[in-house]
């Protein structure tokens, strides 16, 4: 028997589709169904590496965890990773197939319809229910003929759609009605209900609006979800402007850590765990501060989807000089993936993998050289920190080979790669340990490594060490999500929409 399906679409980006999808995944998992998530096409530089080395969006990996299953590439068969304002690396079934402009991708896209359909059908054959997430809005007139993620997917099997609107942004009734008006009659018929998301205050104040909406559209409101602070769910796409547009003041009673906000930053979720630490203030730095401002306790160069371009940006923006000033004043400096490459002396791109720039000088804080290669390394790893034996679990996503000088000790020893026992060095550290880099994304998610490193920074301040923090587990977050469905959705209407087994 083919699986049932339900689809979550939205009136726009950032209205809560990913969270609602995860909540439905967890709710139906707790109801005893075998559930899987699906998103036909995702655009994000925050990716996840599956056990077999494929790349998918992190949101689908999180949703799979909510379902109690391992993520596979079929859950997100097409992933677009922007490498510039005009081009993206196209990843199909977990593997890169090339870098394309929007026009090139639109010409290529018809080949992906069957990939999306086959992936959805494979999941449908294996699970009782597939919870499908759309992207952006289904009513983008200029993009509808290229659709492989919204109504085109819903129409493949007549999947019922729930439309989500964000009342916190204002104008939610106009967004919901306007979105419906821009759909054709077949698409409108697939929309079964609305969700009003991120409501604050007395819900009875919405009663008149809900009655009007239901009468106007002849569609029911499935539920009104409250605004929930600090769900501890990773951002699917770019870092929200709220995190960097208004600079946070330095807190002298806490560790102040600065992440350089590169134009093509990737895997910014690497720093979410740091941000949740009670003794840390995390700052995203988009421009060089004035010379008299106090210096941080740590500067981090993050991953980049376009390392050569972002290295050029560091120089043109003055941030390279700022990092050098921090280093000269004995501030520790760390680099993750592309940031690790930038810390070296030289970056070479003889094949033009990243750009037309064949050679660039790095920041010169570590004695190492990187050569970009055509083959992309994507693998899940287990490792331990050299000298401290803190275990970390993470993943590598890069297209470069870095050769540190023999005198530089490695930062980590990788002990397992895609489930196979190995023994190889990763990263490098300066002789005094003040500058270090690694190819491993997710190292700060390891509680003991994170706390031991933060305690080393605290020691530099003359402060006592702290124990590892008890961050909310995924299970706790999933329970919160399932409770949102149980407490705020019309259960009878939800069962009617999903249908009988």
Model-based region annotation:
Residues 355-379:
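Conserved P-loop NTPase catalytic core
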Residues 337:
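Catalytic nucleophile serine of serine hydrolases
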Residues 320-325, 348-364:
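An internal, acidic/charged active-site-proximal segment
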């Amino acid at each position: 028997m083919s699986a049932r399906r339900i689809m979550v679409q939205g009136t726009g980006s950032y209205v809560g589709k990913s969270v609602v999808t995860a909540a439905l995944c967890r709710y139906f998992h707790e109801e005893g169904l075998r559930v899987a998530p699906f998103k036909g096409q995702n655009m994000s530089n925050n990716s996840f590496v599956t056990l077999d080395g494929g790349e998918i969006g992190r949101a689908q990996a999180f949703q799979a965890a909510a379902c109690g299953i391992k993520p596979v590439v079929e859950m997100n068969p097409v992933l677009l990773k922007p490498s510039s304002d005009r081009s993206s690396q196209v990843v199909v079934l977990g593997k890169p197939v090339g870098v394309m402009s929007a026009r090139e991708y639109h010409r290529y896209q018809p080949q992906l319809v069957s990939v999306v359909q086959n992936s959805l059908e494979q999941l449908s054959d294996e699970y009782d229910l597939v919870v499908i997430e759309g992207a952006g809005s289904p009513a983008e007139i200029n993009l509808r003929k290229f659709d492989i993620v919204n109504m085109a997917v819903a129409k493949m099997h007549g999947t019922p759609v729930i439309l989500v609107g964000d009342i916190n942004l204002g104008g939610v009734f106009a967004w919901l009605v306007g979105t419906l008006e821009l759909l054709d009659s077949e698409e409108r018929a697939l929309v079964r209900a609305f969700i009003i998301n991120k409501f604050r205050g007395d819900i009875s104040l919405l009663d008149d609006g809900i009655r009007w909406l239901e009468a106007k559209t002849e569609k029911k409101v499935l539920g009104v979800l409250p605004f929930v602070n600090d769900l501890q769910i990773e951002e699917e796409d770019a870092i929200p402007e709220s995190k960097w547009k208004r600079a946070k003041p330095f807190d002298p009673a806490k560790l102040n850590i600065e992440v350089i906000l590169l134009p093509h930053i990737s895997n910014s979720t690497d720093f979410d765990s740091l941000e949740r630490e009670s003794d840390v203030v995390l700052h995203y730095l988009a421009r060089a501060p004035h010379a008299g401002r106090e210096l941080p306790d740590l500067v981090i160069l993050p991953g980049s989807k376009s390392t050569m371009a972002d290295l050029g940006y560091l120089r043109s923006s003055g941030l390279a000089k700022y990092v050098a000033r921090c280093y000269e004043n004995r501030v520790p400096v760390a680099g993750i993936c592309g940031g690790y490459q930038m810390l070296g002396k030289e970056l070479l791109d003889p094949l033009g993998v990243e750009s037309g720039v064949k050679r660039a000088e790095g920041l010169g804080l570590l004695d190492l050289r990187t050569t970009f290669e055509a083959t992309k390394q994507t693998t899940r790893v287990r490792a331990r920190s050299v000298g401290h034996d803190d275990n970390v679990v993470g993943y590598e996503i890069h297209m470069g080979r870095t050769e540190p000088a023999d005198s530089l000790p490695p930062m980590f020893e990788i002990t397992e790669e895609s489930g196979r026992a190995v023994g190889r060095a990763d990263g490098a550290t300066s002789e005094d340990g003040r500058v270090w880099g690694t190819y491993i994304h997710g190292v700060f998610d390891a509680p003991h490594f994170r706390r031991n490193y933060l305690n080393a920074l605290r020691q530099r301040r003359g402060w006592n060490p702290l124990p590892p923090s008890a961050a909310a587990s995924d299970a706790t977050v999933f329970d919160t999500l399932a409770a949102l469905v149980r407490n705020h959705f019309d259960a009878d209407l939800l069962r009617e929409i999903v249908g009988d087994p």
